[in-house]
Amino acid sequence: MPHSVSEFIRFYNSPFSYWCNKTNKLVDEKKIDAKYKIQINASKLVSKQLLTKAQEHEVVLKDKYRISENLNVVDMSNKDSSNKVFLEQLNKNPDVIFQPYISSKDFVGRLDFVKILDDELHIIDAKLSSSIKTEHIMQLFVYREILETVSKKQVTECFLFLGDLQMHKVEFDKYKEIYAELKNQFMDFNNSYDPETPPYPKKGEELQEYDDEAKKIWIRDNGLELLYRIQAKQIEKLKNNDIKTVEELKNTNLEKIDGMGEATFIKYKKLAQLLNDSTENKISYEIKDASLNGLLKPNKGDLYIDFEGYPFLTIGRNFEYLYGIWSNNKNDSFTYYWSDDEEEEKNSFVSFIEKLLEHLELYPDAKFYHYFSYEISSLRKSAQNFGVYEKELEQLIEKKCFIDLFTIVNSSLLIGASSYSLKTVEKLAGINRTEDLQSGMESIQYFEDYFFNEEYELKDLIIEYNKADCKNLYLLHDWLASLL
């Protein structure tokens, strides 16, 4: 039974995720016992809207061939397809065949475009990505293998039609050995598959909807993967020195190891100690910079900002549907700007920037606090996209009006947690969330249901979630200042 190309790419990104997906598929097909069923993190499933966007991107290229270039395009996307049907169409010598579904002994897949030029073929794959990724090249290798096997013709060139609406030629030479090795690993993996023995999930793999399952394994095994921002290569270096768990790292008498800087090793030892001492409700921490990277105490007029963006409406930037602002004046207040279309988004952006500029006239020393770099990146993209307030925004940034509390936390504290996300770090300040909505990924799902499925009651829940993020930024700032 041939494997799908998408399965092969999932394996490339994460053998663990592939094993989980294969196991669940076998359970659903009643080929193995239901006890092997693995829970998924639904918030990490591929968005239906992203799939729709990808299909629209394919149609853009199809129409370019069909209308702009006046080529004869055979559309097999909605037809029962087989190798036989594909070959029948190929023998009619059209210019392009769109989405044929074909198979070889090892693989089966639906190619986006096959371009026919005399006795040679070209493959074009449409991707919304802004750049060529190795997984795209691996996918094209499989497509080429299938197509050459079925057609008995040579595929001489492959291209990617990316989000910039340009063709990008793919060079295969330096990837031949990588693909051959990957295919061998994939086949061997399937030949030795056992529902009782999953591969160990490695740090840095694209675990997708099985990330929670991986975390369960890391917690069960007290795995080094639990350490904040540790990389797979660093884990291997520790294991090469017989340090396989957080507990063993905490207790080791070693002061350094080969291939890892002494300061880095000491940092991970300290993180292991803090992680070991932490509980679900109480996270241990240590101050490593008494000045907290120059953190200012909360000042009258300071604002706390957080945005909610949706990534699948436009290419190259998020649709910013919610700008939130919390003010720490005597009458703690929350202001927000909601958008349902791009015109409203522009108006919201303009209103937001004007709010900041007017606020500075009242409070010249005010700072605008946020968490991570998303807000600054978003504002710059919006200013550029809408062609307004670009100069004023850059002046605010240059004057250091914006303060990233993540930078303060990351540079000043060591925390006994696997993540330094706001949802984690705010626990240090004793903040307990009560909102129904608990994560950024959930907010994206809620917005999809609101926007596309007309579940309008979800709007209030999203706004409450954003309000909590903004207010909790203030509470976190206040707690951090208490450490000074």
Model-derived segments and spans:
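Short linear loop/turn motifs
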Residues: 77-81, 251-255, 264-271, 436-448
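Conserved DEDDh/DEDDy metal-dependent 3′-5′ exonuclease domain
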Residues: 78-80, 89, 93-104, 108-190, ...
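C-terminal extensions
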Residues: 211-327, 333-334
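Metal-dependent nuclease catalytic cores that hydrolyze phosphodiester bonds in DNA/RNA
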Residues: 1-117
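A residue-level signal for conserved active-site and pocket-lining positions in enzyme catalytic cores
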Residues: 14, 113, 143, 231, ...
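Short, amphipathic alpha-helical segments that act as regulatory/interfacial helices
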Residues: 58, 62, 144, 380, ...
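Acidic, Mg2+-coordinating catalytic module of metal-dependent nucleases/exonucleases
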Residues: 158-164, 170-223, 232, 241, ...
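Generic beta-strand/beta-sheet core signal
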Residues: 252, 305, 326-328, 369-372, ...
